[in-house]
Amino acid sequence: MSRVTNTPEWQKLKEYSNKLPHMRELFATDSARFDKMSLKACGLFLDYSKNRVTEVVLGALFDLAKQAQLEARINAMFAGDIINTTEKRAVLHTALRAPNDAVVEVDGVNVVPEVHATLDKIESFVASITSGEWRGYTGKAITDIVSIGIGGSFLGPKIVTQALRPYWTGKLNCHFVANVDATSLVEKLKLVDPETTLFLMSSKSFGTQETLTNTLSARDWFLQSGASQADVAKHFAAVTSNVAKATDFGIDEANVFPMWDWVGGRYSLWSAIGLPIALMVGMDNYRALLAGARSMDEHFTSAPLAENMPVIMGLLSVWYGNFFNAQSHVVLTYDHYLRGLPAYFQQLDMESNGKSAMMDGETVDFSTGPVIWGGEGTNGQHAYHQLLHQGTALIPADFIMPLQSHNPLGEHHVQLASNCFGQTQALMQGRTYEEALAELAASNLSDDEKSLIARHKVMEGNKPSNTLLMDKLTPSTLGALIALYEHRTFVQGVIWDINSFDQWGVELGKTLGNDVLARLTADEDASALDSSSNALINLFRKGQI
C-alpha cells in the first residue's frame, strides 16, 4: 500500500463503503437529509443528498482531507508557492481574477498590477474593434473574428462564448479553429471576408504545431486576397509570450497580449486567451465572468471543509473512484447554452488528474482521474442514460440546470426541469422486481411472461448524482461554475498527492508526432520505428491502402 492508502482515514472509508444501506433507506429514515446535504454558494445551489453517503461517511471524507493537509495546499496555491513541482512553476490562474488591490507574488514580484494592466489593454482593444474604429486594409470595419488555438487556448474561449450567447453584443461573429486538419480552417474561411476579418492567434510559444500551421495558412489566404505583408498588422493579433516571433510574423507589438508560465493552458480562459469572449459579450460581461470565478475562489479559501462546495464535490469523486471502482463520471447539462461544458470539464479533469506518479515519483496503487464525459439533457435520456440506469458500471452523475430560461417558451422549461429532476430520482430510487411486477398486473400477459418482463424492468437504483442549480445562466454564475470544477479537480489531486498541473503525456505525444512528421516527409521508406508505425507511414506516402 502507498502512503495515501495506508492511512487510518483511508482504511476507515474502505470499511464504510462495504456496509452502506440503499439510498432509498437513507431518505426514508431521515426526512431532513436534503437540508443537511445541500449548500448554496456564489449563485449556485448544490444538492448532494442523492449520494451514497451518511453523515459519518462525510465526516470520514473530511478527515481524509485533513490528513492530506488540503487547507494548507489550498493556501499554498493561492499564495503563489511552487506547487507544480515537476515544472517548477507557481499555479496562479486565480490571480487572473483577483481584485486590483490584491497582492500575489511570483519570485517576489506582485503580478496583480500586470494582470489588471492586461485587462485594461483588452478593454481598449475590444472597444476599438466593436466601435468600428479599427479598420482593415481596405478601410472597412471588422465584422468577424477567427480565433486560432488548441487545447485550453481553444476550448475554454469557445465553450464560454457559446454559453454566453444571450449576452452577445451582436457586433461581431466569432469562429474557432483548432484542429490541424485543413478542413477545419477551410470551412471557416468560407464564412468570412479577408477585408473585414481579424485573426487572433493564441500560443504561448508562437510555435505550437497545430496553431502555427493554421495561422500560416490563414495568412497565406489573407495575402492571396490582394493584401500585402504590411497589411497583416491590421488583421492579426496574438496572445503569446514570444513577442519577437509575433512581430516577425507581421503582428504589431501593440496587439500582442501576454501569457505567463504560471497559468496552465486549461486554466487560461481568464487571461488574454479569453479575448474572444470579451469581443463577443463586451467587457462588462467579461469582468462579471471573472467576478463570478473570484467569488468561488473566496468561498474555496474561506469556507470550512464541511461547507465548501468544491471540497465536497472533489471528495465525493474520490469516494466513488477509489472505494466503488467508478471509472467514469458523467456531466449532464440541462441547458442548451451549456452543452459544451462536458467537453471543457473533460479536458480540465482528465489532463489534470490523468496521472500515475505521486508527487515524490512513487507509482500510485489506486485509481486517479476518471473518464469525464456527458452531454445535453434531454437528448442523452434517449441514448446513454440507459447505461446509467441499468448498466453494470457505477457512473456518478452531475446534473446542471438554471431555474430560469433565457427563452421562456410555453411549457418547454418546466418539461426540461421535470426530466432533470425525474432522472435524479430514478437513478436514486430505481425499480424493484415487486414494483415492476405490480405495474404489469393489469396486462394480458401470462404469469410467466409478467415475471420475465418484470426482471428486465428492474433497476437497482442507488446510483449517485449531484444536482447543481442556478437562478439563471449569467456571466457571473458561469464563472463560478467553471471555478467550482477547477477547484474540485485540485481537491482530488491533493487527496491523491499527484501534480494536477503538468501534462507529460501530452508532451510525449507532441515529441513523437514531430518525429513521425519528419519520417512522413522523408524520401525513403520508414524503417526505424516499430513495424506497425513503419507500415502506417508507408501507406500514407502511397496515399492508398
Curated annotation (Swiss-Prot):
Q: Does the keyword Protease apply?
A: no
Named in its record, the pathway it takes part in is: Carbohydrate biosynthesis; gluconeogenesis; Carbohydrate degradation; glycolysis; D-glyceraldehyde 3-phosphate and glycerone phosphate from D-glucose: step 2/4
One MF term from GO for this chain? glucose-6-phosphate isomerase activity
- Set out the biological process GO terms recorded for this chain's protein: gluconeogenesis; glucose 6-phosphate metabolic process; glycolytic process
Which EC numbers does the record give? 5.3.1.9
Task: Name the Gene3D superfamilies on file.
Answer: 1.10.1390.10, Glucose-6-phosphate isomerase like protein, domain 1
**What keywords are assigned to this protein?**
Cytoplasm, Gluconeogenesis, Glycolysis, Isomerase
Q: Where is the active site?
A: E351, H382, K510
Q: Which GO terms describe its cellular component?
A: cytosol
- List the catalytic activities from the record: alpha-D-glucose 6-phosphate = beta-D-fructose 6-phosphate
Q: Where in the cell is it found?
A: Cytoplasm
Asked if Electron transport is a keyword of the record, the answer is no
HAMAP family listed in its UniProt record: G6P_isomerase
NCBIfam families attached to this UniProt entry? PRK00179.1
> What is the role of this chain?
Catalyzes the reversible isomerization of glucose-6-phosphate to fructose-6-phosphate.
Which PANTHER family does its entry note? GLUCOSE-6-PHOSPHATE ISOMERASE (PTHR11469:SF1)
Q: Which family does it belong to?
A: Belongs to the GPI family.
Q: What is this protein called?
A: Glucose-6-phosphate isomerase
- Please tell me the species this chain comes from: Shewanella amazonensis (strain ATCC BAA-1098 / SB2B)
Q: Which gene encodes it?
A: pgi
